[in-house]
């Protein structure tokens, strides 16, 4: 009888241990899936915005080109259209435009940079962000991950940007969104998991 009781106790402990382990594993899987889903959502959001912006630029180009308007005036019309656009709840999303050689054509939040070649600009981790965005655009569009300040001379935060090319003028056009909120939420969830581990 005693051996039976001991066996039942061991079995019960094993069941509890497996359930506890499964709980931790499920929690880790949830955090991983949350992170992937949040980043995928932002990537799709950026891509959709840029698809619309490219269609807008193409429409302006075709309409004005058909009227015999000069390329200089067409470029001005496209850039004027993009200049005041802001996206997302924090209004920190904007359209930036660069020539393929890295020269800034449109930088709405820092006009002093327009006309400068920024191809050599690196983020705090050594990512040549303009160069990579141009390469992504030339390949048909793509996402680049880097760190960028929210304010001039401020602390850099993780950011996703999606870039497309506008072939008539050899432009790279893009927009980005800060993703530090995702990292903060993941860190918060990991802290909760650590409490479960104790």
Each predicted region: which residue ranges?
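Extracytoplasmic
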Residues: 127-196
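Amphipathic coiled-coil signal-relay and dimerization helices
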Residues: 103-109, 156
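Extracytoplasmic/periplasmic sensor domains and loops in membrane signaling proteins
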Residues: 68-81, 110-151
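Extreme N-terminal signal-anchor transmembrane helix of membrane signaling/transducer proteins, especially
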Residues: 1-26, 198
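Short N-terminal helix-loop-first-beta-strand/juxtamembrane motif that initiates sensory/input modules
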Residues: 44, 83-104, 141-143, 194-198
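Amphipathic alpha-helical segments and their boundaries
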Residues: 19-45, 192-197
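Extracellular/periplasmic ligand-binding regions of membrane signal-transduction receptors
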Residues: 28, 36, 40-80, 110-116, ...
């Amino acid at each position: 009888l005693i051996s039976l009781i001991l066996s039942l106790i061991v079995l019960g402990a094993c069941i509890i241990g497996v359930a506890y382990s499964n709980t931790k594993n499920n929690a880790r899987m949830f955090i991983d899936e949350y992170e992937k889903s949040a980043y995928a959502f932002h990537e799709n959001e950026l891509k959709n915005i840029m698809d619309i912006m490219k269609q807008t630029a193409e429409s302006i180009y075709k309409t004005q080109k058909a009227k015999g308007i000069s390329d200089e005036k067409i470029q001005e019309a496209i850039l004027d259209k993009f200049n005041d656009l802001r996206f997302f709840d924090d209004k920190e999303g904007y359209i930036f435009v660069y020539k393929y050689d890295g020269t800034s054509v449109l930088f709405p939040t820092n006009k002093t940079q327009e006309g400068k070649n920024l191809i050599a600009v690196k983020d705090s981790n050594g990512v040549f962000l303009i160069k990579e965005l141009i390469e992504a655009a030339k390949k048909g569009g793509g996402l680049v991950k880097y760190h960028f300040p929210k304010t001039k001379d401020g602390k850099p935060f993780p950011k996703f940007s999606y870039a497309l090319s506008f072939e008539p003028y050899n432009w790279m056009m893009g927009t980005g969104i800060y993703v530090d909120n995702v990292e903060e939420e993941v860190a918060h969830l990991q802290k909760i998991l650590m409490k479960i581990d104790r």
